[in-house]
Amino acid sequence: MITRMQIRIQRTHPQAILPTYAHGPAEDAGMDLHAVEDVTLEPGVARLVSTGLTLEVPPGFEAQVRPRSGLALKHAITIPNAPGTIDPGYRGEVRVIMLNLGRDAYTVHAGDRIAQMIVTRYEAVEWLEGSLADSTRGAGGFGSSGR
């Protein structure tokens, strides 16, 4: 079952486009974020791309910013800090760090879909310091499960 929540949003740029579900929330978990400016990404260079939006994420939730698979596959464009987190207390503009891993320059145009945003619940953690329970895996990591 899909529940709906309301989140306050403000456009800080006249060309800003509200985040949208391409196929509706029953089929898409992520909403598309759009650029409000033209930005050329040179190979090997990361740039901040503006969305012209500010959010008021409710306490107990975060908004995660993730790459779009089509940009990654077709143009080798990614988001190096993915998933980027928009915390409940942040009120600045949502901007996306975009990195061109390809060989050719890529230009993002105003209105282009540049990332996906997912709003998800998180839990506050209280640490219980002490020894840990045994497990089958133990301290094995970094390829310990085989090829």
Swiss-Prot record:
CDD domains given in the database record: trimeric_dUTPase
What reaction does this enzyme carry out catalytically? dUTP + H2O = dUMP + diphosphate + H(+)
Which Gene3D superfamilies does the record match to this protein?
2.70.40.10
Q: Which GO terms describe its biological process?
A: dUMP biosynthetic process; dUTP catabolic process
Alphabetical keyword list: Hydrolase, Magnesium, Metal-binding, Nucleotide metabolism
Magnesium: present as a keyword of the record?
A: yes
Under which name does UniProt file this protein? Answer: Deoxyuridine 5'-triphosphate nucleotidohydrolase
